[in-house]
């Protein structure tokens, strides 16, 4: 009998082990779809980004008009741009759901997979930030100025670091050029990290909603989950195309329709919606260095999740108190997102400070305490 090429060919064998014959728990829910959706987001962003880069000019005098040219004169340029801009939003929606799933179902106990995932999140955030600067509108320019300026809060080397990042004494042509180079490079770095992420995941196999070992009754990935993933793709690409075609500027900032002007500051400088929660935490501390540290901690705190897991059960499926706390955390993040979009005035300042404090208290203190309490309740 001839050998099955799918199982014997060096390259096809790898694909087979990852996408076809991969043993998968039989009970993983739709919350497990977001990993593959992130893969589709990445592919979409790289393809649309590549097409946009072919028509983009990384120069302060030409960047804004080169994008206007892409939208007006390039075949379907408007569609490519709208898909790329809104694709970023969907990328973040998927990654936040993916992380939320990981927290809820205790997936962070696969430490290597979790840690590479956080590094992926940080790289994605960096990519989105440098990408937002490229259209060289008002919010692009001032967003770049405000966020890069935060590095100056680092003692002793801060100012040098900022001027080194800028390539001068303000955000100018060298900054735009290097941001374009970084925005082109980072997605490929994300692709590499994704492969590492998957390698670690396939070492242990997938977690499942019950948080128990499912080795005894695993099923092949194809056709069961390949079909389920394709349904997921359709359900994500439909709202993405709807948004890109019917309301492409819904999530953008109107300020960005004005070319960058270093002499005019916009009344409210704010990032894209997916960074607002972190921006609110940054603003809630009246000290520059303190704000920067809180901003970094808001994401880096995820590294502590495996260490703060005190429960005897892996998932929150049978832990009602932890569930309540988890959804309180979600509500809290939505409040932070709202606060980040508001001006710095009463009552938003105090709400932001309370929500920021609550965010850290829930993750660092209340989750471990609640887990310990639930462990006690198991004995009754």
From Swiss-Prot:
Cofactor(s) needed by this chain: heme b
Protein name in the entry: Cytochrome b
Entry's cofactor comment: Binds 2 heme b groups non-covalently.
Keyword vocabulary terms for this entry: Electron transport, Heme, Iron, Membrane, Metal-binding, Mitochondrion, Mitochondrion inner membrane, Respiratory chain, Transmembrane, Transmembrane helix, Transport, Ubiquinone
Cross-referenced InterPro entries: Cyt_b/b6_C, Cyt_b/b6_C_sf, Cyt_b/b6_N, Cytb/b6-like_sf, Cytochrome_b, Cytochrome_b_C_euk/bac, Cytochrome_b_N_euk/bac, Di-haem_cyt_TM
UniProt: heme b b566 binding residues: 98, 197
Transmembrane segments: 34-54, 78-99, 114-134, 179-199, 227-247, 289-309, 321-341, 348-368
Chain segments annotated as coiled-coil in the UniProt record: none
Misc. comment: Heme 1 (or BL or b562) is low-potential and absorbs at about 562 nm, and heme 2 (or BH or b566) is high-potential and absorbs at about 566 nm.
Primary role: Component of the ubiquinol-cytochrome c reductase complex (complex III or cytochrome b-c1 complex) that is part of the mitochondrial respiratory chain. The b-c1 complex mediates electron transfer from ubiquinol to cytochrome c. Contributes to the generation of a proton gradient across the mitochondrial membrane that is then used for ATP synthesis.
GO molecular function, one term: metal ion binding
Subcellular location: Mitochondrion inner membrane
Keyword Transmembrane helix: yes
Protein residues bound to a ubiquinone: 202
Main location: mitochondrion
